UniProtKB/Swiss-Prot annotation:
The gene is rpsM. GO terms for molecular function: rRNA binding; structural constituent of ribosome; tRNA binding. Residues 99-126 are annotated as: Disordered. It holds the Pfam family Ribosomal_S13. The keyword Ribosomal protein applies. It comes from Porphyromonas gingivalis (strain ATCC BAA-308 / W83). Located at the top of the head of the 30S subunit, it contacts several helices of the 16S rRNA. In the 70S ribosome it contacts the 23S rRNA (bridge B1a) and protein L5 of the 50S subunit (bridge B1b), connecting the 2 subunits; these bridges are implicated in subunit movement. Contacts the tRNAs in the A and P-sites. GO terms for cellular component: cytosol; small ribosomal subunit. Belongs to the universal ribosomal protein uS13 family. PROSITE patterns: RIBOSOMAL_S13_1 (PS00646), RIBOSOMAL_S13_2 (PS50159). Residues 108-126 have a biased composition (Basic residues). The keyword rRNA-binding applies. This is Small ribosomal subunit protein uS13. NCBIfam families: uS13_bact (TIGR03631).
Amino acid sequence: MAIRIVGVDLPQNKRGFIALTYIYGIGRSSAITILDKAGVDRDIKVKDWSDDQAAAIRDVIGAGYKVEGDLRSEVQLNIKRLMDIGCYRGIRHRIGLPLRGQSTKNNARTRKGKKKTVANKKKATK
């Protein structure tokens, strides 16, 4: 039986705190905290969870964590807000350059995308 939490099917053969990291917005440390609050041993595999344990985990996540779609939309709204107010980070988001001071002369290919070739300038004849 697959256990589904906030729209994500958790892998059955992984330990609980690793399986919870498949949910967007939950890392290892927050997964351990969630399992401790729910009273579930973190080393039990997901397939061995009872329905009560899964329900307790759902309750803890629902009460105290913003995950999946809500978190994704909040991040997108934060980026949109930066672009709307026209701050430095917003401008860099808009033109697709690194935000945090990295050099862009030679690198930053991940952020800038595939290389665009520019035609060579004609050399002045002597």
